[in-house]
Amino acid sequence: MIIFQPGDLSEYTDLIAEESVSIRAVRRVYGELSGETIENLMPKDIYDIAEGTRTGNREAALKSFDELGEIAGAAIVSALHIVDGMVVIGGGVSGAAKYILPGMMREMRRSISTFSGRDFDCLQMEVCNLMEADDHKRFLENTSTWVQVPFTKREILYNHTKRIGVAISTLGASKAIALGAYAFALQQIDRKYKG
């Protein structure tokens, strides 16, 4: 299924996603929209402009983060068609999550359609922003029901609701890598001595 058509999100459809989902992308888009020179601007500066604590074009700053979220959302949607798992956003630009997540969630929740006009969600699963209380509660909601296993008298608990959670990492890259390496090492030790 093709869900990212040329021209849908960006005029740069022949470039890798990182050209629109990176520090340099935030700077480039801000410069294009504001008409200002960006040589001395870092994403933190553009974030401060979005916050209103630094002079500059606030609308351009907000749009630069929103576009990053939108393109990141499109890339994540493509990945979620083949990988079933949580979406955790980290790295330097995650500090601007409140400006990035709306575009990302909008893109991940968008509809696509057929030539006959039939609309459906671009993802099979419901997308929950775990940084928002209502979405977090909905993500954790138990909608399981008992179903009978065919050709047996057994019943099992089955959750028919497909959900995916989107969260922002608060660990930082170094700590996340260290914890992952530690968990992997423990797993390998368990395999060696229990297997």
Region spans (language model):
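ATP-binding/phosphotransfer module of carbohydrate and carboxylate kinases, centering on a glycine-rich
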Residues: Q5-G195
